[in-house]
């Protein structure tokens, strides 16, 4: 039965609501060489459980590039991707798609959920 009390019940779902460089604070804009912060829900990262975060973009030669990122930390509402060396030389205007594959829940067999968000380099 769906009722008003369930309208905002998002517990158990992965969500990426904003990605920004620590200094710019402009949502969905990252700056080369700056720390990248992610805000959302259920952003707990565990490499041991098989979680992954990747960044993909098209380089100047038209080739698709993808790199795996290792978050420095992740909690429920936030994740720190550090200063990814692979993204340090991207030119302004480049679109980067971040893909988060995280197991949400405490159980060992918690389901993997996927969230994507595209940002641009400022």
Task: Identify the function of each model-found stretch.
Residues 68, 84-91, 101, 115-121:
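Terminal, compositionally biased low-complexity regions
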Residues 31, 74-76, 89-93:
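Surface-exposed coil/turn segments at beta-strand junctions on protein surfaces, enriched
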Residues 43-64:
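Short, surface-exposed alpha-helix to beta-strand junction/turn motifs within ectodomains of secreted
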């Amino acid at each position: 039965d769906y009722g008003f009390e369930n309208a905002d019940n998002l517990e158990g779902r992965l969500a990426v609501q904003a990605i920004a460089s620590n200094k710019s604070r402009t949502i969905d804009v990252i700056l080369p060489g700056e720390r990248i912060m992610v805000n959302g829900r259920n952003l707990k990262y565990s490499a041991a459980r098989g979680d992954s975060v990747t960044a993909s973009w098209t380089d100047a030669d038209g080739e698709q590039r993808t790199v795996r990122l290792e978050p420095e930390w992740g909690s429920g509402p936030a994740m720190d991707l550090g200063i990814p060396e692979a993204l340090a030389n991207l030119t302004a205007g480049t679109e980067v798609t971040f893909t988060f594959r995280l197991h949400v829940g405490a159980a060992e067999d918690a389901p993997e959920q996927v969230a994507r968000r595209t940002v641009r380099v400022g």
